[in-house]
Amino acid sequence: MSNIEPSNVKPSNIELGTIPLAEAPATKLEAAYIAKKIAPNNSNPNAPVWVFVHGWGASANTWAPLVDELKSQCEIWLLDLPSFGGNTQAVNSPSAVAADIAKILPANTVLVGWSLGGMLLPLIAQQIEQHWPTKTISHCIGLAANAKFAQGDNYTAAMPAETFQTFCANFNVDPTTTWSRFGLLQAQGDSNRKLVSRQIKALHNAPMPEQFTAWQQALTWLGAIDNRVLLCEITTPFLHLFGEGDALVPADAAVAMAGINPLHQTLVVASAGHVLHFSQPAKIAQIMLARVHAKRNKARVAKSFSNAATEYDSVAYLQQKLANTLCEWVPEQAEKIADLGCGTGYCGLQLQRPERDIYSLDLAQGMLHTARSKALAKQQLFSGVCADIECLPFISNGFDALVSGMSMQWCEDLPAVFSEAHRVLKPNGEMIFSTLGPQTLFELREAWAEADIKLGRQGCVHVNTFIELDRVEIAAKQAGFVIEQTSREIHVLTYDSVMPLMRELKTIGAHNVNPGQEQGLTGKARLKAMAQAYEQFRTAQGVLPLTYEVGFYQLLKV
């Protein structure tokens, strides 16, 4: 995850009433919930509709800054919850609200919710999965939405229960004053606090006397919802965004949510408070769009390594040898360590000490499952998170050390990787990692190129490419790291023929996942031509070599 810096943004000048609308709501239920439908100029009928659900004390107006960023790229529906905005529906439970919203959703949806609205997303997703087989939620994106709003039942990454109870009691006595104080809390901890406060005053309306009772009821929903079990059961993809300075939903919730379901992606947005979409709308829009339109190769990397997880250790002797070297570089005094790209958990097991807390992170859920099984078999604790090294779901200044063995080469954005690593490390924390250089697999790359020329099929990408190690060092320094130690090594594996070489690459998940790869099976003629071309590398000892260029690095955050 990139370290999200505060944007220089102005208060939104959107007046939702002036935005062109799509067709009017057709049913009574739609008329109650849908405040606005906003169609882009060039609408793609196959694209998902983005549906937004606001939080307590707000209305559809809260999304104005994000609408400004997204309106040209997707169709948008803005909903009002019962007794908020223009929705006068009387609904007596969160599950009933979720059922209503599920009924009115279009066939293909990206569902976005903030605070209470975000806590409703798992309930809505459950409704769709269980009762609406013709509808799909392609992504759920929660902003400042915890699994449980207040502490209790062994969940501590939330607002203290006493604080929440006091707030509810104060609202019952003096709703208007309490709502005003709530606005101050929403802006607290945000580097754009003044901007957020102005936006709250402009876009959030205080409750009217006839709304007091319904808003009090909505507060009880906020305290009653506990999505911990549901988040484990639903299959809809989730992205959870949290503000680093949020005074209502602590940033620690990111780790807690990742622990509930390691397949969900979580992200802590630096310098943001509770109303992330007021503070940094451009950045939040960018994050959401990137999630929904994620590059295919990342998904292919995850799938490739997930498929390899069960057999990976049987052929990963080089990877384990390199991991042993890496672990020797980790400071003994490091107590809180994150293993980035943990694979089957080899590094984590080597680093385990009674006094250490180790967090294992991987993009491939299959690898995490294998790592968890290995740890439990050794009666060791396991904390696993399914996430991208470029999008770390951790708070700032939290780790003594980061370890990453042979994973960095799969990242697309090295500046983001090092920026994130620098953010989550404590001062004087260290990042120790190994990665592959461009000489890696050069024999296979050249053999395929020669075969393609012979068969008149130039331009195909058969072998993963790796960046120059000098560029790795430059990116690390630009992020603020000092390079304490570095080493470059060449390792050569040998094989009797090409086929076991290819099978081994597939078994460890390191076969081609680059853009430009031809789809479908590789024909026998092409494999034969490649094998013949590879023969030029056969050594005097009668074996075929396969080269790995490896860089080791120890970085210091100063």
Swiss-Prot record:
Q: What is its EC number?
A: 3.1.1.1, 2.1.1.197
Catalytically driven reaction(s) = a carboxylic ester + H2O = an alcohol + a carboxylate + H(+); malonyl-[ACP] + S-adenosyl-L-methionine = malonyl-[ACP] methyl ester + S-adenosyl-L-homocysteine
Keyword field: Biotin biosynthesis, Hydrolase, Methyltransferase, Multifunctional enzyme, S-adenosyl-L-methionine, Transferase
Its annotated pathway reads: Cofactor biosynthesis; biotin biosynthesis
For this UniProt entry, the molecular function terms from Gene Ontology, in alphabetical order, are: carboxyl-O-methyltransferase activity; carboxylesterase activity; malonyl-CoA methyltransferase activity; S-adenosylmethionine-dependent methyltransferase activity
- The residues annotated as the active site are S115, D246, H274
A Pfam match is Methyltransf_11
Origin superkingdom:
Bacteria
Q: Which residues bind substrate?
A: W56, S115, L116, F182, G183, L184, L185, Q186, H274
Function of the protein = Converts the free carboxyl group of a malonyl-thioester to its methyl ester by transfer of a methyl group from S-adenosyl-L-methionine (SAM). It allows to synthesize pimeloyl-ACP via the fatty acid synthetic pathway. The physiological role of BioH is to remove the methyl group introduced by BioC when the pimeloyl moiety is complete. It allows to synthesize pimeloyl-ACP via the fatty acid synthetic pathway through the hydrolysis of the ester bonds of pimeloyl-ACP esters.
Q: What is the protein name for this chain?
A: Biotin biosynthesis bifunctional protein BioHC
